[in-house]
UniProtKB/Swiss-Prot annotation:
InterPro entries, per database record: E_MERS-CoV-like, E_protein_bCoV, E_protein_CoV
Recorded name of the encoding gene: E
Taxonomic superkingdom: Viruses
Protein family: Belongs to the betacoronaviruses E protein family.
UniProt protein name: Envelope small membrane protein
Major localization class: host cell
Subunit structure: Homopentamer. Interacts with membrane protein M in the budding compartment of the host cell, which is located between endoplasmic reticulum and the Golgi complex. Interacts with Nucleoprotein.
Length: 82
């Protein structure tokens, strides 16, 4: 075999190896970014579940109780009681 054929085969093998390594590194970086985004979404969901949902429930319950008891107010005491 001619010597330049060995050089071309070696160059093809090295280029294929470099391309494979670059693709693997790109894949790992993309997976890391997607994992970080997923973690942020899970944290936001946890904050919503643990903080905002109970706050809305307490606010709505108190508001409904306030309006309910506004309609059923007891009468004022007579003036001679004061």
């Amino acid at each position: 075999m001619l010597p330049f054929v060995h050089e071309q085969i070696g160059t093809i093998i090295v280029n294929f190896f470099i391309l494979t390594v670059v693709c693997a590194i790109t894949l790992v970086v993309c997976l890391a970014i997607l994992t970080a985004i997923r973690l942020c979404v899970q944290c936001a969901s946890g904050v919503n579940t643990l903080l905002f949902v109970p706050a809305f429930y307490i606010y709505n319950t108190g508001r409904n109780a306030y309006f309910k008891f506004q309609e059923n107010r007891p009468p004022f005491p007579p003036e001679d009681w004061v």
